[in-house]
């Protein structure tokens, strides 16, 4: 390994800097072409990409298997391996996402809020592409297609920097994206993948405001905190996915069991999986033994307060552990859930607003007024009534795909789709008016 200041290390850094500058410059030029591209051309590129994905399932699987083998040899943890895996079903899902995006209306150039002013001028706002976004993500090779397809549909260019563990999968996917762009007559530089696993590429990408308009990180808390701290351009992000399900009094117990099960166990690794379960005292005795039996059968560890533990004590095979203060903040990404019995909706809302990551939280209830209070008062990017937190996803929300989920309150919040990758500029239409 070269010393940080050795001639070889300095030369390597210079080469990496040159590479990132070329990519940034190319993306900036390509973004102007993308902003002018017609809806028909962009949609054709997306349809072509869907076709290429389906035609290359075997090649993509081979690339992904190489990544998985290397990750397993390196001792990558189970949840991270799950995120790295790109199955034929995953490929079909992102292909469908491309087609769904192609079928959606093109919002670029849309003018909203046009009103005539007392002076006679008409003032409105036009939706335009952001320009160039940088996408930094770990594992999850499907993000390569989600980001690329949204860039195409929204008329933006993007620079993608995936995790080193997924480099083979990402290269294979990015090559298909560039083929689709070229076949559509669009610049290949509109979607570029950083071809190196050198971590210094991240530091360079987030410090190029002359080329990159926004950075969108998806990954572990450490990565996102670093980018938020060091970036010289705006960042759209979320740090954690500490999501909650609150079982209200009154509720449909059978429905609540079904939803609470799905929110936790349908898949453990996504950021919209439930990590906390709050149960109103009035329904706890009827609900907890039933959900406890489901969790026990699936090997879910239950970290409970004293009241919940007492109600779950008779469940065969239940792995019950005392809950700690830190558990309320925890994003487990594993078969573990924290459980608390609360007095009612007031305590549930207070608990969620104190401990959640403001990502996605759900109430299961038969009380319309409680549902409305929950929607108004829970300070999260997505709030749900009688539905699993696992629905907090751009594809499920009808966005076609998502670039990420933002828990910030500016510029975008919740799943970030096409509109989240645009900005509004004022347009003024006149007929020779002058200001007096």
From Swiss-Prot:
Q: Which UniProt keyword terms apply here?
A: Amino-acid biosynthesis, Cytoplasm, NADP, Oxidoreductase, Proline biosynthesis
Residue ranges spanning the membrane: these are none
* GO cellular component terms, semicolon-separated: cytoplasm
Q: Broadest EC class?
A: oxidoreductase
UniProt EC number: 1.2.1.41
InterPro entries registered for this protein in UniProt: Ald_DH/histidinol_DH, Ald_DH_C, Ald_DH_N, Aldehyde_DH_dom, G-glutamylP_reductase_CS, Glu-5-SA_DH, GPR_dom
User: Which reaction is the catalytic activity of this chain?
Assistant: L-glutamate 5-semialdehyde + phosphate + NADP(+) = L-glutamyl 5-phosphate + NADPH + H(+)
Q: Name one GO molecular function term.
A: NADP binding
**Which pathway does the record list?**
Amino-acid biosynthesis; L-proline biosynthesis; L-glutamate 5-semialdehyde from L-glutamate: step 2/2
Mind telling me which SUPFAM superfamilies this protein's record contains?
Answer: ALDH-like
Q: Enumerate the Pfam families for this protein.
A: Aldedh
Q: Is Cytoplasm given among the entry's keywords?
A: yes
Spell out the subcellular localization from the entry.
Answer: Cytoplasm
Q: What is its main location?
A: cytoplasm
Gene3D superfamilies from the xrefs?
Aldehyde Dehydrogenase, Chain A, domain 1, Aldehyde Dehydrogenase, Chain A, domain 2
Cite a single GO BP annotation. L-proline biosynthetic process
Claim: Transcription is one of the keywords in the record: no
Q: Which HAMAP family match?
A: ProA
Q: Which family does it belong to?
A: Belongs to the gamma-glutamyl phosphate reductase family.
Job of this protein:
Catalyzes the NADPH-dependent reduction of L-glutamate 5-phosphate into L-glutamate 5-semialdehyde and phosphate. The product spontaneously undergoes cyclization to form 1-pyrroline-5-carboxylate.
Quote the protein name from its UniProt record.
Gamma-glutamyl phosphate reductase
Q: Origin organism of this chain? A: Polaromonas sp. (strain JS666 / ATCC BAA-500)
Lineage here is: Bacteria, Pseudomonadati, Pseudomonadota, Betaproteobacteria, Burkholderiales
The gene that this protein is the product of is proA
